[in-house]
């Protein structure tokens, strides 16, 4: 396996990447389980786990964020919480010996353009500006396209619904290749 390869684990969903290596998938799932355990101690959730080889070095990237408060208000992870989660994951990985090679562990926030991965993300972030890319071009009034940007209306009957300037677009869930929050600056 030469060159750059990566394994992105859509947390709690295995349906989006059927071509991944069984060994990589197994390692990423074990890392995910340990990361979830560590994140819970800081009242956080794991957004995404990426296991990648970069220039001969294995890298584990965990994006974590605070869970909403009791009133449903969004909160954001702090640098101290990222550090705590990183130390816990590192200890858990050492104890469970999940990764057979030397690796670098990085724990961070998902960033301002947080990826939307789980179906619950499409409900939780309804009303927010999103950008979505599809696997295949979708027929629209302006012609076939793979990129959509607008206000997320939610997930309805396995369709991601987005309000664009020209109207509402319904994108089949299984066609969503990548989705993330976005902002107008």
From Swiss-Prot:
Q: List the disulfide bonds.
A: none
Pfam families assigned to the protein according to its UniProt record, in alphabetical order: DUF150_C, RimP_N
Instruction: Name the source's superkingdom.
Output: Bacteria
Cell membrane as UniProt keyword: no
Q: What are the protein's UniProt keywords? A: Cytoplasm, Ribosome biogenesis
Report the subcellular localization: Cytoplasm
Q: Which GO terms describe its cellular component?
A: cytosol
Q: InterPro entries given for it? A: Ribosome_maturation_RimP, RimP_C, RimP_C_sf, RimP_N, RimP_N_sf
Gene Ontology terms describing biological process: ribosomal small subunit assembly; translation
The family line of this record is: Belongs to the RimP family.
Q: What does this protein do?
A: Required for maturation of 30S ribosomal subunits.
| Protein known as | Ribosome maturation factor RimP
Q: What species was this sequence derived from? A: Magnetococcus marinus (strain ATCC BAA-1437 / JCM 17883 / MC-1)
| Gene for this chain | rimP
